[in-house]
Amino acid sequence: MIRTEPSAPVLRDRFANLEGSTYLISHSMGAAPLAAREALVSYWNDWSHDGPEAWDWWLPQIETIAAGIGSLLGAPSGTIALGPNVSAFQETIASALDFSGERCEVVYEALQFPTVTYVWDAWQRHGARIVCVPSDDGMTIPTERIAAAITERTALVILSHAYYVSGALVDVAAIVKRAREVGAMVMLDVYQTAGVIPIDLEKLDVDFAVGGSHKWLCGGPGCGFLYVRADRRMQFAPTATGWMAHAAPFAFEPAPMRYADSMMRYTNGTPAMLAYLVAAPGHALIAEVGLPAIRSHNIALTTLLLAEADARGIRTPTPRDPAKRSGWIALDVPDGARITQALIERRIFVDYRPGCGIRIGPHFYTTADEILVLFGALDELMR
């Protein structure tokens, strides 16, 4: 593990797109590791040279890559499955639950990323009853309001680790405690935090967790993951399934399904190996730097962001207490969409969300000078 002072960026030379740009968008798409290109070329070489025999090497990599993700999340060995995205894994878990009885409610926050709401809204056709917990300000939801929505009728609580609209962290422990009191399960979405905040899924005691690689984990799109608590792994048999979830996929047995006795039971068809292999170098870089050092550096730079914003009278909806925010800061400036596009044209990479503002997400490779470059450009564009 590399030890670094909070103000010292590291491993900038391991990335392809940091020179010639000011890369402040790791909350949306992490920078591209040079080793990811090597993995892509290696995949091509395996495919072009070995054809179908490449599967002999590719398939064991699924478990290796899953274990690497698990090590970044405090997840025990054998509790992570790989898949294309969070939407697919929401569907997988939904298909494993029974909504025919009194315990048929699915509780989620109104500030959930929309894909979650789309999947579960569709499951109302199959007996699920949705309980959506409202937000007063569109940025946060009181913990006690979420807890009050969880009852003996709740089958599953779907919880954001951090809200995508504001970066506010959620009190996971309090919600899990309430869910345990009434026998409900909890699924935690860590897409907004994995790779920038230390997470211990085993300690949090959630039943499921979902996320993906293309944000802070610097893994590019297409490598999502599902965590299932160790004592629940063999409890579920998803109907959203496929041949790779079978106990003996290469036996090509006809139905009925015989599920794998591993996390492969939560997968479906032929795995997208290219996405998994390309994601792994990013995961390795996160492990090399270490999440405590990453978080410390991120807090230092987001604190600098807040100070520069305050000096200019720029409002931010992001929590000011670092213990209550994820890895990015939002700046609520007039004509934010236009200014964001102008920044991108200067190769200062940020993004914009309506109702939130310009989002800036520094990572372990970000320098303090890059924060000042951003504000210098803002000073010009806001005149």
Please tell me what each predicted stretch does:
Residues 1-383:
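Pyridoxal 5′-phosphate
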